[in-house]
Curated annotation (Swiss-Prot), chain B:
Required for KRAS signaling regulation and modulation of cell proliferation. Regulator of KRAS prenylation, and probably prenylation of other small GTPases. Required for lymphocyte development and function. Not required for myeloid cell development. PANTHER family: DRAB5-RELATED. GO terms for cellular component: endomembrane system. Belongs to the small GTPase superfamily. Rab family. SMART domains: RAB (SM00175). CDD domains: RabL3. It comes from the Eukaryota. Keywords: GTP-binding, Nucleotide-binding. GTP binds at residues 16-21, 148-150, 179-180. It comes from Gallus gallus. One of its GO terms (biological process) is natural killer cell differentiation. This is Rab-like protein 3.
Amino acid sequence: MRKLFKDYEVRQYVVQVIFSVTFAFSCTMFELIIFEILGVLNSSSRYFHWKLNLCVILLILVFMVPFYIGYFVVSNIRLLHRQKLLFACVLWLTFMYFFWKLGDPFPILSPKHGILSIEQLISRVGVIGVTLMALLSGFGAVNCPYTYMSYFLRNVTDADILALERRLLQTMDMIISKKKRIAVAHRTMFQRGEVHNKPTGFWGMIKSVTTSVAGSENLSLIQQEVDALEELSRQLFLETADLHATKERIEYSKTFQGKYFNFLGYFFSIYCVWKIFMATINIVFDRVGKTDPVTRGIEITVNYLGIQFDVKFWSQHISFILVGIIIVTSIRGLLITLTKFFYAISSSKSSNVIVLLLAQIMGMYFVSSVLLIRMSMPLEYRTIITEVLGELQFNFYHRWFDVIFLVSALSSILFLYLAHKQAPEKHMAL
Amino acid sequence: MAALDRVKVLVLGDSGVGKSSLVHLLCHNQVLGNPSWTVGCSVDVRIHDYKEGTPEEKTYYIELWDVGGSVGSATSVKSTRAVFYNSLNGIILVHDLTNKKSSQNLYRWSLEALNRDVAPTGVLVTNGDYDREQFADNQIPLLVIGTKLDQIPETKRNEVLTRTAFLAEDFNAEEINLDCTNPRYLAAGSSNAVKLSRFFDKVIEKRYFFKRWQSRFLASRKERDLEEEH
């Protein structure tokens, strides 16, 4: 937490508490999954803990966090300072309304359940969370190999950087000289205007218009030029920063660590391509896998290689390891992305709102990853999740995830391709 | 008008402390209506009368370079910013009175700017830590400005002002505390305006009248050393 708030002070203690609580409960959920696999604790007590955990998390996600978000947004707008609570409640009710409406177009409502049951809430939270997860993983799946592999790095020499810096400084000098002219003109007008600036009736005004019209026209022209030059200087600055960053990456890739990451990048890219491929197949052939990868993998090995395996024993351990890895990497990836995002957009005014938004996103993300993890676990462990979460249409969620994942991956490929193409063209034009 | 001589002053500080508003106030005597984030560097020009009111009065342009960014940026951004630190004649350090972190970051800002511009005689040997002696020997005039004074409630004002007084002493610099949305603080004749004018005079003097400045500088140092001995 300290890392997130290193440069900006988030004064409100409440915000910090809420964030930590959300995070803590989400992690507890994952711990419960692991306990499930390992067989720790009594079965009924596990069930109880699951229920308790879910209730608390849903309470926080659906009731408390949105309310506080509304409260802080309203307190940022100076106009509505008086009736903060009232407006916060209004915002919260709007949120609940939209939240409810969200459920309508999806086939998740079954007539058996009442209005305020856990299943309803989870289904909606699940939809939002799954969408988010799919977007993030789609983008991550494409961005990861792009960042890691040095194949994509453009070649940047010191001369390029120096040339660009020189252009930047020249632009700044031009801006300065123009601003000097404006300042001098203003000063002389001010000094002259002191004498003339008593509009003695109609004629005085006409005289002041004709004497200064030449000066002011010139000034507005210069001002426009200055604005254009400032825009140019901003662009040049961003390009220079980009070049410096690329140069740093090139140097980093020459070290051992860089080479190691490069190697990983190749692996990752194969994995990502495979995932995209699987998603396409799932959608095209309209099939949702019944058995999890681990058991299938072991079955295939046993059948093809004819090795005598104690399937149950090994499947338990392997699935435990796999699930553990998935959990850890997804938590780590999420936190890193959140930290970067937070640095990029935070300011001292809105840091409270942003922290709460992040807590909300994180909570939804974790709830839905529990939903989806069910897919990767062997049959006997699935039962408890199915029990706890009630009768949700799990298949729907998996399909929805695949669709959004595919869409997000394809659009991020397109986006990165365009960005990559644009940059070398800009440098050619220099 | 004849070509006026040029002087470069950097305006440094964390994101959102009010550097752009401050620069606008200093140069146009008007409050900035719609402050937005500064990307890269924005420059503005202030016409300053050196030694106003004396027969030696001469007009100079002072360029205020307002560099945006945060002190914890990646090395690539820092090296990009470093291109603006060439040949500077003075530094204005801006911090937010309501945000303690921004005052603490001023040390790192000043080190970043001063390490870049190393004069052949006054080499700053540093490993990034702050050392008061360096600022005593520092030949580039500094000024510390605290903004958002209006947002501090009356009860806390004294405590905040003592803290900033210590800060300014550490930098061996003058300090001004004001609110960038109110031009009253820099009205002609107020003590703030006098301090500002003195600072700009010091910058110009160091740039153009080195001998005169040097003798004054050495005299003040000798005075301070004598004080410390007692």
